[in-house]
């Protein structure tokens, strides 16, 4: 079957925009694997909400017990913002995915189609960027400790920049997502509304570029930065731990990494590992789809659902990680 020309594609998109319909052979339905995905999603939603909210409450109580006027340490401030980002992702991505898989159709209208699509991507950018901030901060803390000590506002600036970039990079979602109505192969309207990006890009490569940009900012760039930072951290830890292999005295002045800092460095490496392990399968599947869209017909729905659910474990694991290293 010959592919449509750009002019034909443009005419088809105009027809979709004017009639608010899209020809589709098979309308989606809620399958057994979809029901399992919904159940697991809401279970992870409860776990992540409880874990992250509990840590925020613990931080609040810890702050109240501190001496009046004494601020949180830089690491605790970073953990607070990572927890807020994880909680935001939990409260937006998980319920939205669960409810949409239940209804299959989009009942929330055009406005919420755009707004929720924006908030979903914003809440995914924020934890990824906050992970970068933590990795950079901890790496600089051991490679340039004096510079970090003299520049107390650097951490706050990086945190603010992470939230700002998350909001800016998610902005296109407000434009490209729209509500359409699907129809069956005969052209009969089924009243099947969906929130999609069909015909939002003038050329196919515009969408390809946007998808690659989003993928890079959500995964490739954060992964690259955290790997470099954590490689420096691991190298420094290894060098220090081998200074005295028989009796390591971390609290003595001859050691340039005290026990508390050593614990936070290990925690940073654990965060990066959790991020990499949880999200890599999901994005590998996405890359595969870009180069071979027919893979959806070869990869079963349970496998697709599993990779997505595995990614949702990341905001659940993070509170457990800083809970473990806080013992």
From Swiss-Prot:
Glycans are attached at residues 17, 101. GO terms for biological process: cellular response to hormone stimulus; G protein-coupled receptor signaling pathway. GO terms for cellular component: plasma membrane. The chain crosses the membrane at residues 38-57, 77-96, 115-136, 164-183, 212-231, 281-299, 306-325. Its main location: membrane. Residues 58-76, 137-163, 232-280, 326-327 are cytoplasmic. It comes from the Eukaryota. Belongs to the G-protein coupled receptor 1 family. This is Gonadotropin-releasing hormone receptor. It comes from Canis lupus familiaris. The lineage of its organism: Eukaryota, Metazoa, Chordata, Craniata, Vertebrata. The gene is GNRHR.
